[in-house]
């Protein structure tokens, strides 16, 4: 079976590499997140837009800062900001400290989408907790945090 994101479910195959399982779990969670966002009226949000939503400061951020934080190029972030701007999630405003620079800020719609996404991700985690048990989810969280710390250097 293939998910909408194109990820093939392989739960019946033995010895699937752990990184593959992690990718599949992430893909399923992200697919559910985006479907629920769309169901709630937040259209046009894609996975890659998280590079803006996750790294933007409450008071707004410069494009260069978003690029630095996300690890994307300034051009790539600029395109993502343009897409989000077209959907009404962000706006560009003059930077009070430098009139030549622009600050990217979440609009009210963008703030609502960010709050909705956080709530939906919490719902997904709670679903996992109900199915696996709170102790198992806490153990999974700790193990993943340790792997991330190990691999981040």
Feature map (PLM): residue ranges:
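N-terminal leader segment of winged-helix/HTH proteins
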Residues: 1-44
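N-terminal helix-turn-helix DNA-binding core of bacterial DNA-binding proteins
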Residues: 31-76, 153
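Short, hydrophobic-biased segments on the C-terminal half of alpha helices
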Residues: 64, 81-82
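Hydrophobic residues on short alpha-helical segments
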Residues: 19, 53-54, 114
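Alpha-helical structural segments
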Residues: 24, 28, 57-58, 123, ...
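Charged, amphipathic alpha-helical coiled-coil/dimerization segments
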Residues: 3-6, 35, 82-145
């Amino acid at each position: 079976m293939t998910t909408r994101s194109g990820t093939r479910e392989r739960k019946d195959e033995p010895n699937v590499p752990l990184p593959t399982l992690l990718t599949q779990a992430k893909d399923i969670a992200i697919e559910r997140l985006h479907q629920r966002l769309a169901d709630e009226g937040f259209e046009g949000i894609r996975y890659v837009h998280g590079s803006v939503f996750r790294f933007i400061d409450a008071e707004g951020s410069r494009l260069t800062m978003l690029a630095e934080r996300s690890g994307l190029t300034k051009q790539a972030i600029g395109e993502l900001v343009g897409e989000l701007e077209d959907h009404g999630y962000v706006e560009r405003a003059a930077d009070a400290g430098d009139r030549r620079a622009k600050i990217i800020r979440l609009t009210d719609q963008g703030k609502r989408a960010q709050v909705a996404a956080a709530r939906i991700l919490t719902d997904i985690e709670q679903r996992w907790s109900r199915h696996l048990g709170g102790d198992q989810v806490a153990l999974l969280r700790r193990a993943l945090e340790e792997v991330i710390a190990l691999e981040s250097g």
